[in-house]
A protein has these predicted regions:
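Alpha-helical assembly-interface signal, strongest on the long, hydrophobic N-terminal helix that forms
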Residues: 1-62
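Short, conserved structural patches
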Residues: 2, 55, 59-133
Length: 133
């Protein structure tokens, strides 16, 4: 069985039409994976910051630990309220560009709360002023 002359090259033309679409979809999926990975990193940063502050590390040291884990350019904050420590981390993931240039950057955010493990005589975690930050 031989192909008729009007069907020759049809597979190549179909591939030429479909391949750019597959590349664009793949780029979009890779960007979604990057957003998911950044979300995991800010969750880890908030948790690490809260744990460090709850252990009694100073506020600056706790934030520094969180920044080590967080995506580059993220913001990490920590606050003491009563017998609890609340840490927050936020970062931005740039849009994928190219065909998806219309998509804005995505902000990922996470918070973590931990109970103070021990309260020193100063009234707060070590390195904190009495009464919290």
């Amino acid at each position: 069985m031989s192909r008729s002359s009007d069907e020759s090259g049809a597979a190549t033309a179909e591939l030429a039409m479909a391949l750019p679409l597959l590349v664009a979809v793949t780029a979009g999926l890779v960007w979604l994976l990057a957003v998911g990975a950044a979300q995991v990193r800010v969750v880890d940063a908030a948790r690490e910051t809260a744990r460090a502050a709850a252990r009694g590390d100073g506020a600056d040291e706790a934030v520094a630990r969180g920044l080590q884990v967080a995506p580059e350019g993220s913001r990490v904050t920590v606050a003491v309220s009563g017998d609890r420590v609340r840490a927050s981390a936020a970062g931005r993931v740039a849009g994928p560009g190219g065909l998806f240039d219309f998509l804005p950057a995505v902000t990922v955010h996470a918070e973590a709360v931990a109970a103070l493990e021990a309260i020193p005589a100063s009234g707060g975690p070590a390195g904190w002023p009495a009464g919290g930050p």
